[in-house]
Amino acid sequence: MENRIVFFLLCCVAYPVMAKNIVLILVDDLDIELDGMKPLIQTQNLIVNKGTSFTNCYAAVPICCPNRASILTGRYQHNHWVLNNSISGGCNDQKWKDGPEKNTFAIHLNKKMGYRTFYAGKYLNQYGTRAAGGLRKPPGWDYWYGLVGNSKYYNYSLSINGTERKYGNQPQDYLTDVIKQYAVDFIKVQTNNTPFLMVLAPPAAHAPFNPASRHNDKYKGTKAKRTASFNNMEERDKHWLARMGPIPLPDGVLPKLDDIYRRRWETLLAVDDMVANIHQSLKLKNILDNTYIIFTSDNGYHVGQFGMPLDKRQPYETDIHIPLYIRGPGIEQSKIAAPVSSVDMFATILDIAGLEYFSDGTSLLKHNLSIDRTLLIEYKGENSEGRSNSGCPTDSDPNLASYVEAYDFTQDPYQLKNLGYAMKRGMRHRFRRRLKNLVKCKDDQCVAIGPDRY
């Protein structure tokens, strides 16, 4: 009799009476440090101001394909081995397909909890290309509208459940709007009987920075944010790559930075429209109150900081600090300062669905997120295949050049003064020990709190 009672109780836990819907909005290259959220007024009203803001959310890898892999699988880069945006670097290669892709949050929700799953927009940079094996529908997704290749706004192809559909350069072809319409049509036919997981991945604010025609020149005259680090590296204390370019930048470069900054903002206006339409569609179907909406980005972006013109990839706040907002059932309007990571998305989505599974992150729905958590941010560089040349020195080789950087954000929020070499030897050793352990961590070892855990 005892066994029957226990079995019945477990069934009640595993199959909630009314499972929650999940909408993940994953934008591209959206910074938080350079006011990237400012154009998203409707998003702020409908999501940010109605839920929880995670003010210290960081990309596990400050570049598109690897961090999207981390979001999908809950794994740090050293565990999923997507190293960069190239096929040789693991982006949508066969190892990804045979391994990590078979353990995304979509598969768990779809196979274990009966979620109807929907994906529209950018997946992985090399997805659908001939070199990566062509079009396909990745496992775990019922409705698939994946962008072929990297971010575009016009003249692109979508893989619709594995069949190619080409789009042109007319206003109705604008990718963010196309994603919005597929999503709205999907929501219209949903019922409370079957929960759904929806991922919307528009191209904004990634290059080539093409706004929808209705948003052209909406921010005419806007200039790139002149942070204290903009076009400035007085100390010359950053790693070698950051010191390669001319500083200050040539005068002719600054107007180009201003133009791209403005157009990035203008691309986000269509995202803002999309968010408002999704919100309204959920409300009209009377399922908004039963739906979690998550808004985040794959990485940040710099525009002129430390004299580096445009990109991500760097270990500075502009590139690694990303927006993360969640609204939904039981989510109060609040701000959480505890450090969180892209790898937490997997555990969070599973938690919403009533599931648990191994990952390198933790659910953000927990009430005891620690302010003392240490996060790992790793990037192995373009053209890296993860295999060391036999003649390449290792970190135990005294001839290896290495760079140590540390910053006091209380006194130096723009990372102008590197304290890495002035740090006491014991403190530097503790940080180094933490790093060496984190780069080989797996599962709950990665969510270590405080120095005693390392």
Language-model region placement:
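Cleavable N-terminal signal peptides
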Residues: 6-7, 17, 57
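Loop/turn elements at helix/coil->beta-strand transitions in domains of secreted/extracellular proteins
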Residues: 19-23, 49-55, 66, 79, ...
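Active-site segment of extracytoplasmic enzymes that catalyze sulfate/phosphate-ester chemistry
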Residues: 24-27, 31-118, 129, 149-150, ...
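Short, solvent-exposed turn/loop segments enriched in Gly/Ser/Thr/Pro and often Arg
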Residues: 37-40, 52-76, 83, 119-132, ...
